[in-house]
């Protein structure tokens, strides 16, 4: 037993010696001092280095946080703007849809109004054509003409007549309207009424004194219409001017109109025999009135389309031939070098 205990005590002591060896390291004093110095330096410098880096990192973090906060605010503002513009877009789309519906409704109303206006215009044209055709027929009576001129609407009627004929000619624009259309008949009837009124002395006097605008309009329209265009209207206007020329004041007024003589030559170039016939008769009125002829003789003789008139004097149309021959005889009588 004693031997056994003694062995155990020796083992424990050996262990303690081993533990003591592990706790200590044998270092030279010089190395220890150097190590101690370095440790002291590290202990002094490390906080400074760490503090500087930490401060820099902290500042960067602050900047990042500020930037992040600004970006968040900008994002929030963008979201608000988006919602605002989205609301405006929805409102605009709603307004646009409503306006489209309103425009569609207005367009339909406009189309309906145009259709109604067209129907009314057609009705008025038909009514005007019928009424004026009837009036044209009865205006060949002197009593009827006196009744027309005796009313307070005569001047207005002739003003409207001139405006209607002018509008009609402007609307042609090279197009050929149907000869039998209500519009044509309406305008022709108006021109026919003027012709019949001018065929009566009191009618000529009224037109010369009170309705010179109508005379100016007819002269203008005769120049506006192209050769061969709307010949019936040309003939009626020429007949009206011829009737007016029977009145001395009427003839004087017509011949003093700017461009009157060139207009006559222009009308003589028309291919329609009726237009040429009534132009010759109007020229003859000028030639047979000494006071008027003396004022236009020089211009008339210098520009007279003699060859055209000579050709008409040989026309197969007996009326045109006769009128041309009579004019040539009148010109020879006046020593016009014909």
From Swiss-Prot:
Which parts of this chain are annotated as the region Disordered?
A: 1-20
What does the record say mutating residue 167 to L does? Mutant females show reduced fertility with smaller litter sizes. Produces DNA repair defects during meiotic prophase I. Reduces loading of BRME1 and HSF2BP at the recombination nodules
Q: What is its main location?
A: cytoplasm
**Tissue expression from the record:** Expressed in testis and, to a lesser extent, in lung and muscle.
User: Has the keyword Iron been applied to this entry?
Assistant: no
Q: Which GO terms describe its cellular component?
A: chromosome; cytosol; nucleoplasm
Q: What happens when the gene is disrupted?
A: Male mutants are infertile. They have smaller-than-normal testes with no sperm. Female mutants exhibit a fertility with 40% reduction in litter size compared to wild-type females. They show reduced follicle formation. Mutant oocytes show a delay in prophase I progression with the majority of cells at zygotene stage in 17.5 days post-coitum (dpc) females.
Q: What does this protein do?
A: Meiotic recombination factor component of recombination bridges involved in meiotic double-strand break repair. Modulates the localization of recombinases DMC1:RAD51 to meiotic double-strand break (DSB) sites through the interaction with BRCA2 and its recruitment during meiotic recombination. Indispensable for the DSB repair, homologous synapsis, and crossover formation that are needed for progression past metaphase I, is essential for spermatogenesis and male fertility. Required for proper recombinase recruitment in female meiosis.
Q: Which UniProt keywords apply?
A: Chromosome, Coiled coil, Cytoplasm, Ubl conjugation
Q: Where in the cell is it found?
A: Cytoplasm; Chromosome
Cross-referenced InterPro entries = ARM-like, ARM-type_fold, HSF2BP
Q: Which GO terms describe its biological process?
A: double-strand break repair involved in meiotic recombination; female meiosis I; male meiosis I; spermatogenesis
Give a short account of its post-translational modification: Sumoylated by UBE2I in response to MEKK1-mediated stimuli.
Q: Which portions of the sequence form the region Interaction with BRCA2?
A: 87-338
Instruction: State the residue spans of region: Interaction with BRME1.
Output: 18-55
Which named protein is this? Heat shock factor 2-binding protein
Native organism taxonomy: Eukaryota, Metazoa, Chordata, Craniata, Vertebrata
**Which positions are tagged coiled coil?**
12-126
Name the PANTHER family on file.
HEAT SHOCK FACTOR 2-BINDING PROTEIN
Assembly state and interactors?
Answer: Interacts (via C-terminus) with BNC1. Associates with HSF2. The interaction seems to occur between the trimerization domain of HSF2 and the N-terminal hydrophilic region of HSF2BP. Interacts (via N-terminus) with BRME1. Interacts with BRCA2 and BRME1; the interactions are direct and allow the formation of a ternary complex. The complex BRME1:HSF2BP:BRCA2 interacts with SPATA22, MEIOB and RAD51.
